[in-house]
């Protein structure tokens, strides 16, 4: 067992290939962001986002290039689903999902985006209909 990073806040990491992790972390609130972490060297590289705008989501990686993630509900109870292209430095919103106040704390429902093996479909959990359900849509990525 080896420590890779020793930040105060570490959250929602995912593999990017066999030697890199993409995660949301920082030493303090002002430094929170998405970072790329090398497993071999433990070096980090800050990625694209202003964390205050996109918040701590649940990232998944497609082809070591696209980060698909979500946000927590904003003050209007809207969660965003988005994709970020690491090569083009391009952000694109994929959807907005309302979550009523009846879903909060332990009953809240994060989107937890995940992609099908062939990258054609994107799956999310949502309560925008008033009940927790699994939804899917065409990903529009790598098609």
Regions found by a protein language model. Give the residues of each.
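Long, low-complexity intrinsically disordered regions enriched in Ser/Thr/Pro/Gly
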Residues: 62, 69-71, 89, 99, ...
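Conserved blade-ending motifs and adjacent loop-strand segments that build the rim/top face
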Residues: 5-10, 46-62, 89-115
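Beta-propeller blade signature
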Residues: 35-40, 80-88, 136-141
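Short, solvent-exposed coil/turn segments at beta-strand boundaries
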Residues: 14-20, 39-41, 60-67, 115-120
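Beta-strand initiation motifs
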Residues: 1, 41-45, 88-93, 142-143
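Loop/turn-rich, solvent-exposed surfaces of beta-rich toroidal or solenoidal domains
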Residues: 16, 24, 29-32, 48-92
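Blade-level signature of beta-propeller repeat domains, shared across WD40, Kelch, NHL, RCC1
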Residues: 106-143
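Beta-propeller domains
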Residues: 1-34, 44
């Amino acid at each position: 067992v080896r420590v890779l990073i020793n930040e105060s806040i570490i959250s929602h990491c995912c593999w990017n290939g066999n030697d890199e992790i993409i995660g949301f972390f920082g030493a303090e609130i002002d430094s929170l962001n998405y970072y790329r972490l090398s497993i071999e060297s433990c070096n980090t590289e800050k990625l694209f986002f202003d964390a205050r705008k996109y918040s701590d989501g649940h990232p998944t990686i497609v082809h070591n290039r696209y980060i698909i993630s979500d946000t927590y509900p904003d003050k209007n109870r809207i969660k965003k689903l988005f994709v970020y292209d690491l090569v083009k430095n391009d952000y694109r919103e994929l959807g907005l999902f309302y979550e009523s106040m009846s879903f909060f704390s332990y009953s809240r429902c994060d989107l937890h985006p995940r992609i099908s093996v062939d990258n054609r479909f994107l799956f999310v959990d949502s309560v925008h209909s008033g009940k927790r359900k699994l939804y899917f849509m065409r990903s529009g990525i790598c098609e």
